[in-house]
Amino acid sequence: MIEVWPAIDLIDSTSVRLTEGDYETKEAMSRTAEEAIEFYSRYNCVTRIHVIDLIAAKQQTPLETNYIEQLVGLTQLPFEVGGGIRTLETIETYFDKGIQNVIIGTKGIQDPEWLKTVAEKYPGRIYISVDAYIDEIKVNGWLEDTGLNLFDYVQQIDSAPLGGIIYTDISKDGKLEGPNFELTAKLAASTKLPVIASGGIRSKEDLERLEKAGVAVAIVGKAANTQSFWEGLS
């Protein structure tokens, strides 16, 4: 079965979700981050907790470091953290606080050589988050266009010892309408790096389709807060 990494997005140490990455659509989740971690830890298919510091993604510097460290102590599950990570110093600060993996976004898109350097220093522990509206990459909290094509960029980093590529189709994010199956499958076929699907995943059926498409992991946000998503999963 495909692995599930439930997403916890933080603003002011509160678990929230956005729609299409729009900060104006912020809504608090029904469970606190602490309650969510306890709930997710019950399921064998959950192999990691995915945490994003949303304000850091905009302001380009981490703000929730100490709170995330508290969350790490609540479970045996490993954590990966993203949002505003632009320096090796920040990466190592997270590692020192017990975070197993970090997610690089904007900095890695804008500077692929830097991304390769940190991946070589910490092989398998760095993930690149490629956030695109369909296949056009956006950065800085999904607020800025880059003019970069998803597939052209991935070819630049394909040889780096990354943990994987987290692909989010922004047009699907937070809508519970299903991910972009076609483009995600195309991406998985175009790279030797593991592909992690994110954005719009709503059901066990979506997970099964992604697994058939060659996707290694699904990151699930809004749907993971509903009991119905977990029916039939162990």
Swiss-Prot record:
Cell compartment(s), UniProt: Cytoplasm
GO molecular function, one term: 1-(5-phosphoribosyl)-5-[(5-phosphoribosylamino)methylideneamino]imidazole-4-carboxamide isomerase activity
Listed GO biological process terms: L-histidine biosynthetic process; L-tryptophan biosynthetic process
Stretch forming the signal peptide: none
Pfam families, per database record: His_biosynth
Key words, A-Z: Amino-acid biosynthesis, Cytoplasm, Histidine biosynthesis, Isomerase
Covalent S-S links between cysteines: none
Catalytic class of the enzyme: isomerase
InterPro entries: Aldolase_TIM, His_biosynth, HisA_bact_arch, Isoase_HisA-like, Isoase_HisA-like_bact, RibuloseP-bd_barrel
Active-site residues, as the UniProt record annotates them: D9 (proton acceptor), D131 (proton donor)
Recorded catalytic activity of this chain's protein: 1-(5-phospho-beta-D-ribosyl)-5-[(5-phospho-beta-D-ribosylamino)methylideneamino]imidazole-4-carboxamide = 5-[(5-phospho-1-deoxy-D-ribulos-1-ylimino)methylamino]-1-(5-phospho-beta-D-ribosyl)imidazole-4-carboxamide
EC number: 5.3.1.16
GO cellular component, one term: cytoplasm
Record pathway: Amino-acid biosynthesis; L-histidine biosynthesis; L-histidine from 5-phospho-alpha-D-ribose 1-diphosphate: step 4/9
Similarity remark: Belongs to the HisA/HisF family.
Protein name as annotated: 1-(5-phosphoribosyl)-5-[(5-phosphoribosylamino)methylideneamino] imidazole-4-carboxamide isomerase
Organism: Staphylococcus carnosus (strain TM300)
